[in-house]
Amino acid sequence: MNNRQINSLWSSIIIEELIRQGADFFCISPGSRSTPLTVAIARNPKARWKMFADERSAAFFALGYGRATARPAVLICTSGTAVANYFPAIVEASMDFQPILVLSADRPFELLECGANQTIRQENIFGSYTRWHMQLPVPSKEIPLKALLSTIAHAVVKTIGSPAGPVHLNQPFREPLEPEIPDLKDAWAAPLQEWLENGKPSGKSALPEKEPDAETLSLLREALAVAKEPLIIAGNMQKPEEAEAVEQLALELQIPLYTDFSSGLRLKSTTRPWQLAFASPHFTRHFKPDLVLHFGGHIIAKQPAAAIREWKPKHYIVVKNHANRLSPDHNVTLSIEASIASTAAKLKGCRTLSSGIINAATEEFFRRAEEEIDAECIGNKPVTEISAARLVSRLITAQQRLFLSNSMPVRDMDNFACSSHPHAIRSAINRGASGIDGIISTAAGFAEGDGKSTTLIIGDIAFLHDLNALSLLGAMTVPLQIIVLNNNGGGIFSFLPIAEYRDLMETHFATPQNYSIRSAAETFGLDYACPQTNQEFTRCYLEATGSPRSIIIELRSNRAENLHHHRALQARIETLTNHLYQGFIEKISEQPN
């Protein structure tokens, strides 16, 4: 075989084995050095692929795809800075345990660090953010092809294993790079004849979740048995069955359940918006759990963590399905690495000493607090960032998907969403590193992977940050409804102490942009709307979710007014809490010690 044939066969084997292992979606960015890989994908009828002019957008798209499918999309790029553009998405995938596989093309050894064009040190470029990395050899007949097969199979296992996350394979090629059909009867390929004919993966790996041991379960049951005021927290969950198991445990034991938006439970009618209660000092002063049982990852709101620091519960137990530390305040008393669903299921039947008063006392608070939020959504009132979150949470259906940007959109949905759905609404956020970069790309990948119409709520700065991702939407198989909360700047800074420094706030933090979102929609051939009232927004959103076309819905607001709306609503809820919890205090005092 000549070098073209060697490169072609080598690349075809890589791509075929990836597909057989379940990694059959490829995000390709054009480039010369990656020619053998790109050709192998193009000529494999089982490969699904999408082209990306921007590697950064490609990586976030792959991240979203992995979130939706729990399978890695494969990133293909040329040598040089192309692979470096993947870094932000790789960090997010690593920190939030999402599968993603990078297959970067590279120059061979003799072209490294000698001034050769478009050449950087690519090996292990992502450092500790990968679950596994491997510098593959230059394709050569000296390398047994079975070794290549087992390496590819292992790479897929590492990206979907426990914990899931990024894997990087760096593949150098020597020129010439153009394809040429290889001779499959060559002695080099002979050991693969059975693999070439049977269509099966070279090998499979079993990946069972770790079960909680008897001693750990005994410790948990003992702690629950003596708890007088327990609290369960449903944090970031990767699987619906995890969230369902935690919800069922809380319902059976009649323990208050704090459902973070990232748990997937926040919009269900069986849950309560404890976020509103935890935002009230009156509540946290009088509800002091002696046991906190936290399932899953970290949560969005700061108030529960602050309350736990103040309460100093006897037991603060975290159950998670990975070995990474989850104790930002260094106050966890027991950390358990085990299957979340299995652990929750095996705790059913436990008994606690809980009086149940907190559940009864808060029902009236929840009802009246929800009425206060609903008042923001009256039809002829101007649509606000609060009412937009509330209305979307009410109007979205189980057949649709929801993706939230970081910063204010995820906080408003976490705080003000309507818990009214009989079934969980599938949703996602990039909450690993909590950046605002790549949000449109991630939402697009999530929609593509899930195959469902998806609503994205995003701020204007995050929208601008990933503007070129709008070019992806025209070729999407499902539409996106992009709701842009345009307050002309970084609205979250209005809620932070830096807002008091008016000489710095606008120029160095809020950074207003003054770009036309309508023009962006026109540039990329997308539908556009700009409703003014809650009624107009409701009508516009319902029409958009029934359309096969993607749309940008711009909601214009003023940062100062938005801050006022939030503080006024919180003040009304705080007054309500103060009034209602006077009765709560009296009931607590009547309980025997």
Swiss-Prot record:
Cofactor needs: Mg(2+); Mn(2+); thiamine diphosphate
UniProt source species: Pelodictyon phaeoclathratiforme (strain DSM 5477 / BU-1)
Record text on subunit structure and interactions: Homodimer.
Gene (UniProt): menD
Catalytic activity, reaction form: isochorismate + 2-oxoglutarate + H(+) = 5-enolpyruvoyl-6-hydroxy-2-succinyl-cyclohex-3-ene-1-carboxylate + CO2
Protein name (database record): 2-succinyl-5-enolpyruvyl-6-hydroxy-3-cyclohexene-1-carboxylate synthase
Pathway(s) this gene product operates in, as recorded in its UniProt entry: Quinol/quinone metabolism; 1,4-dihydroxy-2-naphthoate biosynthesis; 1,4-dihydroxy-2-naphthoate from chorismate: step 2/7; Quinol/quinone metabolism; menaquinone biosynthesis
Keywords of this entry: Magnesium, Manganese, Menaquinone biosynthesis, Metal-binding, Thiamine pyrophosphate, Transferase
Gene3D superfamilies recorded: 3.40.50.970, TPP-binding domain (3.40.50.1220)
Molecular function via GO: 2-succinyl-5-enolpyruvyl-6-hydroxy-3-cyclohexene-1-carboxylic-acid synthase activity; magnesium ion binding; manganese ion binding; thiamine pyrophosphate binding
Claim: Oxidoreductase is one of the keywords in the record: no
Co-factor binding comment: Binds 1 thiamine pyrophosphate per subunit.
Protein role: Catalyzes the thiamine diphosphate-dependent decarboxylation of 2-oxoglutarate and the subsequent addition of the resulting succinic semialdehyde-thiamine pyrophosphate anion to isochorismate to yield 2-succinyl-5-enolpyruvyl-6-hydroxy-3-cyclohexene-1-carboxylate (SEPHCHC).
One of the GO biological process terms: menaquinone biosynthetic process
Family as reported in the entry's similarity comment: Belongs to the TPP enzyme family. MenD subfamily.
Lineage: Bacteria, Pseudomonadati, Chlorobiota, Chlorobiia, Chlorobiales
E.C. no: 2.2.1.9
